């Protein structure tokens, strides 16, 4: 039975806004029913004529009897990532908040299920060397533009236009005010919404904060350099890590010097076959691989070991991480939407001399800016409102969260934004990267967000638990890339359905063409490559393995290079089937 949700009487338009009808739906990985639908908006909001596009909307309803009128909204990063894909994880992480509040998720125009601007820039599939080529390969981008322009005006997918879409959806659902959580680029989107619709925001959380004048990718080189030095310094302060790598800074210099002389050979697991494959690794891609690792607090704990191996001539771990990062971009992001945003809001405003200065002497260098500028020369440039790059000063209670060693959005960025927000608090998570995975005590951050939204104010918010967050021990053992053969009986005993122990994930382990695959309900499918009788690599996800507990019938997924710390535990859902 469809659910009709009345439109808000406080809508900005004089005419009553359309009523958005949502229907009960199943979301993979989500326990219980959600409510789903689509909402049409004008592609050209200014002229209100021509093409209309559909936005994907998911509401995860509140579970308790005492319901608050203002939902919790998530705006994802990228730019280009889907927000609705995060429904299961958000419902699990913020279960206490969901007791009283709906979780509202809308895929921003150009992403996910909202007229996605996807570009297949690293094809053909299985071409590993192609996937390890330019970050913005120009011919595929030119072809993607030609394909998308058949039914899209690529100049109309900027942040300001998209945030007016979100407000229209809010009104159509009958919500008066929102509690917004923005992550990474989503913090820019949140600030834009706060500027354009301040009376509609009850609270805002900015996680991995992007200042309005950040000009992506201008600050990638110095940000990554700062993060790398910080992580290596923490290794030097840990007894075991320092003992294993006493000359780590010197070894790091050797790696970048060697790569600066030309590409090196490395070996990666082919995500299609699971077989080791030789590839050529450039300095740019090696730097990108290390930068990807620094994004993750857990993977950053592997950086010293990976650089040490590379200094000894083994570049396989770096190549694996560069490849998995590229595959993740293809799987989760909309390259066309990324270009439509950054080619209007960022790249045109970068001074080439400033880009050269900020990149000088960093391990990243200027390759990203040079390639992104060339890509934007091929992409239509949208317009931005006057004053778009100016700081936002909305009087909205705002909690800003940064990781100490975030390579993309360092704490300084949050301080810069908070300076103009009269009701704000900025906190820095020790040891944290762009994501806070793998840190001990990190549930403190989630609890602070929940308390803040429930109170609607920063008054009395105690942040002392932040100081108790710790990094797990650095990985000091080398990564070995090896694949073994398994018998039919060995493969068969692992088949079946699994549930995450205490979490939202659902998975199916299946056999296809004699190989095992794990299919996550919400996260996609991965080939499993056996490295031991009960131990499998998730091909294309760097540093992750599945460890089967055959006696207990459970499966544990652990990151290969963080001393076996579990990140996911699966338990059988049903009896094993052949």
Where are these regions (language model features)?
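Intrinsic disorder and flexible/low-complexity segments
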Residues: 302, 325-326, 371
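Generic recognition of flexible, low-complexity loop/linker segments
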Residues: 328-330, 385-390, 414-416, 484-486, ...
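Bacterial N-terminal signal peptides
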Residues: 1-8
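Structural motif
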Residues: 269-287, 295-299, 328-336
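Peripheral terminal and inter-domain segments
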Residues: 371, 472-578
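Long, low-complexity segments enriched in small/aliphatic residues
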Residues: 307, 314-353
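Gly/Pro-rich cap/lid or specificity-loop segments adjacent to the active site
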Residues: 12-285, 340-479
């Amino acid at each position: 039975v469809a659910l009709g949700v009345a439109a808000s009487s406080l809508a900005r338009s004089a005419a009553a806004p359309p009523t958005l009808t949502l229907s009960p739906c199943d979301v993979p990985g989500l326990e219980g029913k959600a409510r789903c639908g689509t909402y049409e908006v004008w592609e050209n909001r200014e002229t209100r004529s021509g093409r209309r596009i559909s936005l994907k909307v998911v509401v995860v309803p509140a579970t308790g009897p005492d319901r608050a009128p203002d939902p919790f909204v998530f705006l994802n990063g990228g730019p280009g990532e889907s927000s609705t894909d995060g429904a299961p994880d958000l419902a699990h992480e913020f279960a206490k908040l969901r007791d009283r509040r709906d979780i509202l998720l809308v895929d921003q125009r150009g992403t996910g299920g909202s007229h996605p601007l996807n570009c297949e820039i690293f094809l053909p599939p299985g071409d590993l060397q192609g996937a390890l080529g330019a970050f913005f390969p120009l011919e595929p981008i030119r072809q993607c533009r030609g394909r998308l322009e058949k039914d899209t005006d690529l100049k109309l997918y900027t942040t300001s236009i998209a945030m007016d879409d979100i407000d229209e959806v809010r009104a159509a659902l009958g919500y008066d005010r929102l509690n917004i959580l923005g992550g990474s680029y989503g913090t820019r989107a949140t600030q834009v919404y706060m500027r354009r619709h301040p009376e509609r925001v009850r609270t805002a959380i900015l996680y991995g904060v992007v200042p309005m004048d950040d000009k992506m990718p201008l600050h990638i080189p110095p940000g990554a350099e700062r993060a790398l030095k910080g992580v290596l310094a923490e290794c030097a302060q840990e007894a075991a890590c320092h003992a294993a790598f006493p000359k780590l800074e010197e070894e790091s210099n050797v790696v970048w010097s060697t790569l600066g002389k030309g590409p090196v050979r490395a070996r990666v697991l082919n995500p299609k076959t699971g077989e080791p494959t030789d590839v050529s690794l450039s300095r740019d891609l090696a730097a990108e691989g290390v930068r990807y690792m620094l994004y993750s607090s857990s993977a950053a704990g592997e950086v010293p070991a990976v650089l040490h191996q590379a200094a000894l001539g083994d570049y396989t771990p770096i190549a694996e991480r560069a490849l998995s990062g590229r595959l993740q971009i293809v799987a989760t992001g909309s390259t066309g939407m990324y270009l439509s945003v950054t080619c209007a809001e960022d790249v045109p405003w970068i001074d080439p001399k400033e880009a050269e200065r900020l990149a000088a002497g960093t391990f990243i260098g200027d390759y990203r800016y040079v390639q992104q500028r060339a890509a934007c020369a091929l992409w239509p440039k949208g317009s931005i409102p006057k004053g778009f790059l100016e700081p936002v000063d909305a009087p909205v209670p705002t909690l800003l969260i940064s990781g100490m060693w975030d390579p993309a959005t360092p704490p300084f960025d949050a301080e810069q934004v908070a300076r103009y927000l009269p009701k704000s608090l900025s906190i820095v998570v020790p040891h944290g990267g762009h994501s806070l995975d793998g840190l001990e005590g990190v549930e403190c951050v989630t609890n602070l967000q929940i308390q803040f939204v429930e109170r609607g104010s920063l008054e009395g918010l105690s942040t002392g638990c932040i100081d108790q967050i710790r990094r797990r021990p650095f990985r000091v053992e080398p990564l070995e890339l090896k694949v073994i053969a398994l018998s039919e009986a060995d493969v068969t005993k692992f088949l079946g359905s699994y549930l995450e122990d205490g979490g939202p994930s659902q998975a199916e382990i299946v056999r296809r063409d004699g190989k095992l695959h794990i299919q996550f309900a919400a996260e996609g499918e991965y080939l499993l490559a056996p490295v031991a009788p009960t131990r499998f690599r998730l091909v294309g996800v760097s540093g992750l393995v599945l460890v089967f507990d055959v006696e207990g019938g459970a499966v544990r997924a652990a990151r290969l290079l963080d001393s076996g710390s579990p990140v996911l535990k699966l338990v059988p859902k049903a009896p094993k089937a052949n």
